[in-house]
């Protein structure tokens, strides 16, 4: 049987107190809507329709290519939101999943089990329910004396007895598609909110003698709907625990999972060790047997096997096998370290490629440079690559030795096996195997110090 999906992403999210549409707030580096769409994609959906409304264009811009969407111009309730998908889905034969775009913790495994249960029960509607420790704010599942689902009552419409019920509606359903769209033509706004409730179709089905099933979630956390920043932080914490657990099961050592923040799209190889207070974000790849020490931050980068990142920041950069950085180094966007490169204390590199075995041990800035193999940078080396308007490139060939406190005024080229003397200001190309000395001659003026303000006498 064909499977369809409707993802509800039209709400403003007033309680978020944000200019950003609620479904675009991020959990573990990815929008809540993106998490939901990923889970939906795991159950072989034939047609997926996203309902957009508030800030529709911003939401549409984030959708995967080819995703169908419908704009809900007026937010008149969940029933209305589903009904406006009729032109795309009403005539289809099959089962339709309806899910909110602010439920980032729901898994593809759960959705697959929900479809299986729906088909096994031969139901017209199947509700994903959960037993809530505190059901306040949720719609309650009302069952008859035989235990069958009778209806769903929203919090604002519930009486005291109904409010005491702990089985709640998670807001995720599967319906027989044609039955759903027929029932949606019968719902009204006769309720406390003055809205078209999707949940009213359950009562319509029940009165028609159709089968209503309820599948109870094993993990209540999956049902979390995010309506404010408190719930957003709860979702973030739960997702982080889930992500960290998966990495540890796959052979990654996390010294302190409670202070380790790893985004959902990060890949990490076995035998890697990650110390406390580490943040790894975006589409980052980390290979096998990597050490990442306390306080490091890595974002959208590739760190290949046997590398070390010690108390450092790596952004949009690539570290090849066996290279190491830190402590307190900063690889800025566009940096590429070849194999066995060493970048040490207080070194900043941007938009540069360093060849195999090159070393920049301390207190160095390398920007817009192409550096060969086994080049040595002395402490205090600066590539002066910016004149206030334009950036300029520096080329340094294999085996060059850059003396301490050298200032390299780009654009220029330093040849193979060349050497710059310590303290040089390099303003011209340096040929292969040449020694460059670009500093003023030292002059000692004997006795002159006695006339200087610092002088303290014998």
UniProtKB/Swiss-Prot annotation:
Catalytic machinery residues: 362 (proton acceptor)
GO biological process assignments: cell morphogenesis; cell wall organization; lipid A biosynthetic process; peptidoglycan biosynthetic process; regulation of cell shape; UDP-N-acetylglucosamine biosynthetic process
Region (N-acetyltransferase): 251-458
Residues annotated as binding Mg(2+): 102, 227
Enzyme nomenclature, EC number: 2.7.7.23, 2.3.1.157
Region (Pyrophosphorylase): 1-229
Cofactor note: Binds 1 Mg(2+) ion per subunit.
Compartments where located: Cytoplasm
GO MF term set: glucosamine-1-phosphate N-acetyltransferase activity; magnesium ion binding; UDP-N-acetylglucosamine diphosphorylase activity
Family in the record: In the N-terminal section; belongs to the N-acetylglucosamine-1-phosphate uridyltransferase family.
Name of the protein: Bifunctional protein GlmU
Organism expressing this protein natively: Lactococcus lactis subsp. cremoris (strain SK11)
High-level lineage: Bacteria, Bacillati, Bacillota, Bacilli, Lactobacillales
Annotated gene: glmU
